[in-house]
């Protein structure tokens, strides 16, 4: 994933976090390839949100617009395909059922956190972002990094992970 796409995605996720303040957990999956990754299935929605559209730094706008149209889209993961460096929104409300990753994990983190961790090692998944009341985490190949964290009712943006990939 190129640096511009990483920075743009990071900015969009922080906008979602700031606006959501955190009413519900949000999972965003970036993947490559022509097909959706294994171990996920769409949940039917009516009305269905607009999908299969190129994102141009407007994921937060599209997400909250879709949420107004049908609040049930908040249940499930958002899938974004990277096609030649261009992010394309492929869908909302995906159920995840990845195989269990055999790694030590934090206790009491919930199903969204654990599904994000496990799904990050699925073939063709670039990374999984998990947004909840504590901030934004990025899972890549079973490794977790905090991108943004809420402390004392203030949002602190960590140095962008792209600038300092070794920091957690």
Give the label of every model feature segment:
Residues 1-168:
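Divalent-cation
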């Amino acid at each position: 994933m190129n640096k511009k796409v990483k920075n743009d995605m990071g900015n969009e996720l922080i906008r979602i976090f700031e606006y959501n303040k955190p009413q519900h957990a949000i999972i965003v999956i970036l993947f490559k390839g022509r097909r959706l990754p294994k171990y996920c299935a769409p949940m039917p929605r009516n009305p269905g949100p607009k999908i299969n559209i190129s994102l141009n730094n407007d994921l937060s706008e599209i997400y909250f617009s879709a949420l107004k149209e049908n609040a049930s889209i908040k249940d499930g993961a958002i899938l974004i395909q990277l096609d030649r460096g261009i992010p394309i929104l492929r869908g909302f409300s995906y159920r995840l059922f990845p195989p269990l990753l055999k790694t030590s994990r934090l206790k009491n983190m919930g199903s969204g956190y654990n599904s994000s961790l496990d799904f990050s090692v699925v073939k063709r998944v670039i990374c999984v972002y998990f947004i909840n009341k504590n901030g934004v985490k990025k899972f890549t190949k079973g490794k977790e990094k905090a991108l943004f964290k809420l402390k004392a009712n203030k949002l602190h943006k960590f140095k962008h992970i792209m600038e300092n990939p070794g920091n957690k």
